[in-house]
From Swiss-Prot:
Lineage: Eukaryota, Metazoa, Chordata, Craniata, Vertebrata
The protein, known as: Somatotropin
Presence of the UniProt keyword Cell membrane in the record: no
UniProt source species: Ovis aries (Sheep)
Molecular-function GO term, any one: growth hormone receptor binding
GO CC entries: extracellular space
Gene it is expressed from: GH1
Length: 217
């Protein structure tokens, strides 16, 4: 039988994941900064896992194993997010301030809002993407959470001009085309990478501020 402590933690995590940011900020204005960070980390972790699972399923279904490595080293695998000075790992992220990491995370999230509106049309028969029509909503929730954290840290007006030089294309619904398959494969790879960065930045900030034992990741 599961102990009361872990069970309570799991229930709290599930509740936070399902709770809209409007409720967090509006109905519970006294919610602690640690609670806002915990909520953001859970949402980013959930989205990153979904992105990773989807990439793996797409790769297994459509991309021959012998071609995967070569494709990942071509232009199709280039991510537009690489045009911004974003840390590439935990050590680099620790050199940035919390507000810098939040601004970068916001840019990464916002770069996907357009393409992900069409995601469910591409993966209508996918088991992993059975909830693909909600990915956009989840991403919007995370965007709101990051903005809430920025407001808490008194950065009311995010810097103008910090935008991606390019943005991501929409996913191609013509899955019978080789070009479309390669395009979608590249987009899913970038989505996975960008969500991994976002999750890493949020976890670095949370651990740095609150020094939790679970900071070794």
């Amino acid at each position: 039988m599961m102990a009361a402590g872990p069970r309570t933690s799991l229930l709290l995590a599930f509740t936070l994941l399902c709770l809209p940011w409007t409720q967090v900020v509006g109905a519970f204005p006294a919610m602690s900064l640690s609670g806002l960070f915990a909520n953001a980390v859970l949402r980013a972790q959930h989205l990153h896992q979904l992105a990773a699972d989807t990439f793996k399923e797409f790769e297994r279904t459509y991309i021959p194993e012998g071609q995967r490595y070569s494709i990942q080293n071509t232009q199709v695998a280039f991510c537009f997010s690489e045009t911004i000075p974003a840390p590439t790992g935990k050590n680099e992220a620790q050199q940035k301030s919390d507000l810098e990491l939040l601004r970068i995370s916001l840019l990464l999230i916002q770069s996907w809002l357009g393409p992900l509106q069409f995601l469910s049309r591409v993966f209508t028969n996918s088991l992993v993407f059975g909830t693909s029509d909600r990915v956009y909503e989840k991403l919007k929730d995370l965007e709101e959470g990051i903005l809430a954290l920025m407001r808490e840290l008194e950065d009311v007006t995010p810097r103008a001009g910090q935008i991606l030089k390019q943005t991501y294309d929409k996913f191609d619904t013509n899955m019978r085309s080789d070009d479309a398959l390669l395009k979608n494969y590249g987009l899913l790879s970038c989505f996975r990478k960008d969500l991994h960065k976002t999750e890493t930045y949020l976890r670095v900030m949370k651990c740095r501020r609150f020094g939790e034992a679970s900071c070794a990741f």
